[in-house]
């Protein structure tokens, strides 16, 4: 596994999963000038990144410690885990907190029942359906 070179390790954000949500987050963070690295098991997924994406990409299985270490997870400021699989997301969040002490971990979950698996870890959970509903309510002026 080859680590990216020339990466500024200070204030780095790592995104795990380059599906629709991960690519959107990575593209927006890149546009904001964030120091960014994104990991996905499929190189084809990176085609969703914009042409002006300024971060780094790593192809690999995110549950593999060697892949996580090649993404400099030990020194990242924040980790955003947004694969389409709750089980993988919970596992990577647990690894990030318990093994690497990542200070800010954000995890996408589809099933609210899985949130209990992260209880006590200090992980912030993202529920896309709830966010969509909240935005919908704001649009229609509901309180």
Predicted segments with their positions:
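Cytosolic regulatory regions of ion transport systems
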Residues: 1-143
């Amino acid at each position: 596994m080859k680590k990216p070179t020339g990466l500024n390790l200070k204030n780095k954000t790592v995104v795990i999963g380059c599906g629709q949500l991960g690519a959107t987050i990575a593209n927006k963070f890149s546009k904001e000038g964030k120091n960014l690295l994104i990991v996905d098991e499929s190189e084809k997924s990176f085609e969703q990144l914009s042409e002006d994406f300024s971060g780094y990409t790593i192809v690999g299985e995110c549950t593999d410690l060697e892949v996580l270490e090649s993404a400099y997870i030990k020194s990242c400021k924040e980790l955003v885990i947004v694969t389409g699989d709750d089980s993988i997301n919970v596992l990577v969040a647990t690894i990030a907190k318990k093994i690497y002490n990542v200070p800010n971990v954000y995890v996408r979950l589809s099933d609210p029942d899985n949130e209990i698996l992260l209880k006590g870890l200090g992980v912030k959970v993202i529920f896309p359906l709830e966010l969509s509903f909240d935005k919908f309510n704001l649009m229609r002026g509901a309180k």
